[in-house]
From Swiss-Prot:
Residues reported to bind ATP: 183-184, 208-209, 265, 287, 296
HAMAP family named in the record: ThiI
GO biological process: thiamine biosynthetic process; thiamine diphosphate biosynthetic process; thiazole biosynthetic process; tRNA 4-thiouridine biosynthesis
Biological or metabolic pathway of the protein: Cofactor biosynthesis; thiamine diphosphate biosynthesis
Gene Ontology molecular function, alphabetical: ATP binding; CCA tRNA nucleotidyltransferase activity; tRNA binding; tRNA-uracil-4 sulfurtransferase activity
PROSITE patterns xrefs: THUMP (PS51165)
Record keywords: ATP-binding, Cytoplasm, Nucleotide-binding, RNA-binding, Thiamine biosynthesis, Transferase, tRNA-binding
Organism classification: Bacteria, Bacillati, Bacillota, Bacilli, Lactobacillales
Annotated THUMP domain residues: 60-165
Domain of life (superkingdom): Bacteria
Protein species of origin: Streptococcus pyogenes serotype M1
Entry's EC annotation: 2.8.1.4
Record's protein name: Probable tRNA sulfurtransferase
Main location: cytoplasm
Amino acid sequence: MDYSEIMVRHGELSTKGKNRMRFINKLKNNIQDVLAPFPAITVRSDRDRTHVSLNGTDYQPIVEALKLVFGVQALSPVYKLEKSVPLLVTAVQDIMTSLYRDGLTFKIATKRSDHAFELDSRELNSLLGGAVFEVLPNIQAQMKHPDVTLKVEIRDEAAYISYEEIKGAGGLPVGTSGKGMLMLSGGIDSPVAGYLALKRGLDIEVVHFASPPYTSPGALAKAQDLTRRLTRFGGNIQFIEVPFTEIQEEIKNKAPEAYLMTLTRRFMMRITDAIREQRKGLVIVNGESLGQVASQTLESMQAINAVTSTPIIRPVVTMDKLEIIEMAQAIDTFDISIQPFEDCCTIFAPDRPKTNPKLGNAEKYEECFDIDGLVQRAVSGIVVTEITPEIVNDEVENLIDALL
């Protein structure tokens, strides 16, 4: 027998009361986005489960993809069949025969939501357990902690049989907690921050600052590849490329070296906030970790935050660098993040950046800039690209090969 579908059990959605179906429908849409590279797949949801019909597709890559999607509590590859006692008996016998080894213990666990079915749960447990003993007389039944728990569900539309339960990612479906703008540089920290924001249901749009010719096409492709990795957790993500060359040159030419980073980050924050307002976001997300670098001291954060009243979420703010690296490796962004392309935060980095910048000094040094004009030109020049889970080719790898 081949698996018919993957049955997805919902996570925290059980706590969402009247909004439950809105959350479930969002999860369904996210699953469809994540599984877009598998065109034969179909997805449908009800109040208790989401059903991913395989339609001949190999189940293993589907399971690997679904394990990462936020909002999924657990999933099981299942056999779907008609609600017929003879068919159930044959299926249970075939499955247990294929799993059998010496000393194997098992139990049948039946759940019947279709109360019009001819047998109740206890009768089905007895009948199907007896059918297993007919073909495997040496097998042992064990009610507590058996090697195999064969789950049989009798639902209104069909019967389902499964024996594996695979842990999902948990969290909330992406998009159920509103929209935020993720400031993604291309380093290690910001993709991890994005991952953690996605886990709590935030629909992120990625804001990436590019300063050609100082930053290369490889840096842009790297940021897009990082964004693509994040799509595995909840579906398509809008990638917003911001032209930043003019602003960085202005800062380099007019500002004291010690304040280059502070003023650069203040402009980035202004632009991100303007994009957020334009695209109806609610928060800004970044990868700042307290005390990790000069721009991430409390004094620096205060001076940079002063340009906006928008809430700023810093998911990794209390994490050590090694903790962030471990998480980046776990979510498969680390190897991309360490690829050798400079970003806007490093190209003009001063040797001795100010670790305790004063807000008054930052505002004084900005008096020589046309702040509104610079921000407006940057926002009007943005390029928005939808990033999907499907990988056509790996542009960053190609660029690295060309450099070597």
